[in-house]
């Protein structure tokens, strides 16, 4: 007797822009080429935000005393989280971290509760920043959400980790297995004059050798933490120095989350338990820049 197992769909949020960073809309299934370990797969493409699953977003915020100048800015953006990022049908949670992570607000659709969690942000009294531990907590919360929502993390912090017990490679793999996309808004705690600078632009992770980031622990250790996290999950890293820059970056992430294509396909049976590399190409658009996860882990859905 042959026992067959059900392999869950691979679902990929995909951002497609031109060389100037403008979203390319109006693409159809016929425009996409999906390569799974180099082999083409027949995929379904959905571009309607109203028809796709709701967003479950965890906002992960560094609350160390060394981030005091940034906390004053974060207190003003709580209203943007539910309204712009998770959306009317979605839900959001808030996690703060310094020497240890703490759930400040569990998942809710109540925009006022999210806003209150941001307004009540306070410094923790130390200079620690256990970013990876906080992300692991966020991933555990997201793992309890219904399987269908789009799962996102918005990390607002320094670009480095300060004293986590969790390992970068483990957090990366956990996020990939849960199909979570990580977006990062990073800052320098040593910048005291929070004024706009030419460097307040997206930091590209193109060409960083994503498979190497996933499979080589030594290389992961030498990589900027937030760059590794965003690149390995198909997210984006932005940086800010002033209030206007922070709010602009939140809007950029919001727009991207709600304008992505959702590409899905059924992986082969033999893929269960393995990591497969992915490449997505756009036909007849040499100017198209595609950003998504560099691969996927498959599990038995039973």
What is the role of each PLM region?
Residues 1-302:
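Scaffold/interface architecture of coatomer-like assemblies
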């Amino acid at each position: 007797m042959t026992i067959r197992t059900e392999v869950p769909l691979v679902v990929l949020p995909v951002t497609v822009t031109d060389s100037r960073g403008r979203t390319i809309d109006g693409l159809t299934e016929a425009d996409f080429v999906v390569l799974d370990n180099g082999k083409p797969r027949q995929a379904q493409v959905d571009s309607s935000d109203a028809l796709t699953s709701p967003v479950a977003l965890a906002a992960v915020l560094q609350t160390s005393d060394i981030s005091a100048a940034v906390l004053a800015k974060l207190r003003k953006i709580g209203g943007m989280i539910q309204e712009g990022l998770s959306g009317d049908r979605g839900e959001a949670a808030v996690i703060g971290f310094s020497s240890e992570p703490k759930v400040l607000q569990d998942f809710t659709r109540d925009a006022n509760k999210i806003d209150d969690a941001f307004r009540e942000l306070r410094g923790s009294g130390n200079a620690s920043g256990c970013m990876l531990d906080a992300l692991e907590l966020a991933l555990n919360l997201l793992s309890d959400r219904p399987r269908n929502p789009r799962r996102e993390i918005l990390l607002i912090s320094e670009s480095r980790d300060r004293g986590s017990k969790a390992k970068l490679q483990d957090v990366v793999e956990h996020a990939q297995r849960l199909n979570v996309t990580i977006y990062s808004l990073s800052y320098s705690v040593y910048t005291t004059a929070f004024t706009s600078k030419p460097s307040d632009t997206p930091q590209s992770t193109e060409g960083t050798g994503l498979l190497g980031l996933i499979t080589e622990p030594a290389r992961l250790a030498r990589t900027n933490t937030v760059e590794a996290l965003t690149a390995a999950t198909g997210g984006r890293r932005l940086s800010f120095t002033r209030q206007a820059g922070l709010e602009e970056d939140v809007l950029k992430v919001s727009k991207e989350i709600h304008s992505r294509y959702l590409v899905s396909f059924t992986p082969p049976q033999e893929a269960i338990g393995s990591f497969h590399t992915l490449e997505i190409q756009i036909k007849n658009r040499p100017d198209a820049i595609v950003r998504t996860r560099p691969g996927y882990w498959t599990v038995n859905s039973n």
